[in-house]
Amino acid sequence: MATETTNNNVSPKNPAPTVPSSIPTPSISDEKITEMVERVKTDRNVRLSLADGIKDIVNRNLIIVGTGDGGCNIAQEINKACPDTYFVAYNTSARGMDKLNADVIIIPQEEDGSGKVRSYSKEVFCSANGYAQELLQAISSLADKINNLEYILVTTTADGGTGGGVSPMIAPFLNENMDLPVIILGVYPSLTEDATAMFNALQWQSEVEKTGCPYIILDNNDPDVSSKLQVHQKVNAQAAQMIKILTGEMFGPTNISAIDNRDMYMLLKHIGGRICIYGQEGKPPVGKSIDEYIMDMIQYTNSPAPNEVDGIGLFIKGPETFVKNADTSLTKICATYGNAAIRYFHLEVSDDPYIAIIMTGNSEPTDRLMIMKQRYDEIMNNIKKTASSVTDIMSDMNNPLSKPEKKTAPKNMDLSALDFFKE
């Protein structure tokens, strides 16, 4: 992994002073000329080596922190797609953790899952057992091994207890202590999940907004795929593809126009907000514009559509004729999703065409959140109706055993289990 290098020898030379004809010009020996020629050769080699380093400014590395079962599976998929990344897994359950290819695994030994209870996982993470400190130490240790480390990515499912509970805590915690931008990647639940999943996801979204950290949303709600496992695999693969675009894994050096690390920082951190990332191999067929090609990508990606976009990074890679003639005005994109205040472009000549776009500063996906709220209300109303029906049916019923004789309670009975019902 190469380290980004900057060529400081770029200032223009001052024009040579005019030498009056009356002053004799000193002669230069053959040895001096030979020395100067060799120095020029050396300087040229140095400049070429510095030029080789240009390719590194479009690539950036990150550490992934997978939280909970779903978050760790997402992180594993990203780690496979981006081999230069490091992967830390945090979970309150040991189930399946031995199958992960994580660099560091943190499991509270006295716990066995969170049972979808977000507050429980928060308490475990902040407990006196030091799991927050252990995570920070692991991240710090890995950071020392990585060149060109630019971001930390925290992955989770939004509806779970462990990842959904701790990810909005971990992100600002690492952001403050590591002095690195932290991005959260979360996945919304399918609408076929229970009311707790809807409630947890809505709580997670509200907390993520409060962190101020940039975030990416994917969605497990896919009516076209009936198998839950297939949906998860599809979404995890899309997450990996998004991060490959973000890290620059999909692109190389170019002398036309590049989105370097500073440009990406402006998009992801300075503008921030909700980040939407789309990419696809190939190029538009004859008769289809780049805008239409990208809008098709947006439609078929398991992610809420962009809205009120503030920043855009457009990546176009392909044959020279296609790249040079590409329409980068994005007129339809801006008219549909928001007229971004700032845009960056990466144009690269390559035999392997690929088009991608990063759209930042999006507001929260209100329409999708309202659908989850409606689903939650629907489930809870059905529960209330069922309870009311049972009450009505039993209103004139008596226990056929009449009133059984009570058993005498032991003198030293342990009543602590009843505390559970006091909440």
Label the predicted regions.
Residues 2-423:
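Tubulin/FtsZ superfamily GTPase core signature
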